[in-house]
């Protein structure tokens, strides 16, 4: 959480999906469904959201039709993120999975697990080197590990993206290499706000 997932989804859709959608009504509806994103410590996403609600059909490389739908979810809580506590107590939220209210952190974890296990075809693990906001790198390590280990435990294919203000810098390179060594996966650094089409 607070790694740039919503920003990535918005940029991905803006650059790779919306320009290739032929139906204008579908394109406008998809724009309306894009997630909000902002910097800082405050959690923006509150529940899993399919973007777009119905998979968009686009053509890759000119003529290969594919259906694309991303899922924006809260992710596991990062230490230092805010927005899940009101007063001195954790916010209680209603979810589709329980008949009673549950703590926000539990809802985020349940929603994230459901996305990983039940909905995702390919996972995108979004993490950061700590340069994109107010949280430090160490605050992302536990939720990053939990996410990667969960995907590995069920054999779900995934990629790791390291969001960084300096994706070609030494710190981003070092963090990517640490992730690769620790989990045996490829980690790619990038500045997700700056994603551009070709």
Q: Could you say what each language-model-derived stretch is?
A:
Residues 1-99, 117:
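Conserved G1/Walker A P-loop phosphate-binding module
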Residues 146-159, 164-198:
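Canonical P-loop GTPase G-domain recognition
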